[in-house]
């Protein structure tokens, strides 16, 4: 009998009434590769007072309204006075800050994401914290941004919830 990882996981989940909810890959910076990448827009470092009014849908990967108290530092890309990209980091634990990134759709494919991600990683390291980057396994564009920004795969994670909750979430999608 062929006992693949997926088959073993499925049996274990069925027996426990739990199911996989989310699978993600986490990245750490490669200090031999990490460098501030350029882009054609002005980059500005932002502290909590600067981004207090930015908890909007377009910045939901960079900032988390439900966990505002963890959002520590951001780097924004500006086209004149218009914010066109935002990378934010949250203090998910004492020593590690997680980076999230958003760019307005009409400004994508201009190197903004990698410029913001790399700059925020450098700023995080300068504060004595370890930056990390996380994305869903299916988010290939985000994983490519991590690699381009100087990060390398470090670990994977899986969130497990009661099967009825996962079924309900899947019905909504």
Specify the residue positions occupied by each region the protein language model found.
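Conserved GNAT acetyl-CoA-binding A-motif
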Residues: 124-136
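Internal catalytic-core helix/loop-beta-alpha segment
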Residues: 42-69
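Residue-level detector of high-confidence beta-strand sites
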Residues: 86, 154-156
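Conserved acetyl-CoA-binding loop-helix of GNAT-fold acetyltransferases
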Residues: 109-123, 144, 148
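Acyl-donor-binding surface of acyltransferase catalytic domains
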Residues: 1-51
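Conserved beta-strand-loop-alpha-helix junction that forms the acyl-donor binding cleft
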Residues: 133-147, 152, 159-165
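C-terminal helical cap(s) of enzyme catalytic domains, especially alpha/beta-barrels
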Residues: 169-170
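A conserved beta-strand-loop-helix scaffold within acyl/acetyltransferase catalytic domains
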Residues: 64-96, 100-104
């Amino acid at each position: 009998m062929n006992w693949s990882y997926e088959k073993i996981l499925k049996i274990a989940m069925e027996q426990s009434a739990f199911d996989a909810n989310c699978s993600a890959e986490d990245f750490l910076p490669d200090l031999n590769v990490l460098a501030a990448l350029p882009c054609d827009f002005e980059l500005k470092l932002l502290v909590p007072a600067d981004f207090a009014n930015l908890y909007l849908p377009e910045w939901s990967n960079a900032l988390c309204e439900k966990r505002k108290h963890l959002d520590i530092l951001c780097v924004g890309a500006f086209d004149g006075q218009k914010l066109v990209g935002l990378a934010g980091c949250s203090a998910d634990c004492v020593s590690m800050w997680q980076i999230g990134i958003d760019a307005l759709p009409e400004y994508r494919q201009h190197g903004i994401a990698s410029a913001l991600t790399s700059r925020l990683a450098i700023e995080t390291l300068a504060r004595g914290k370890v930056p990390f980057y996380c994305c869903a396994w299916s988010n290939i564009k985000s994983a490519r941004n991590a690699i381009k920004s100087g990060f390398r795969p470090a670990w994977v994670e899986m969130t497990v919830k009661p099967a009825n909750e996962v079924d309900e979430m899947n019905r909504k999608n």
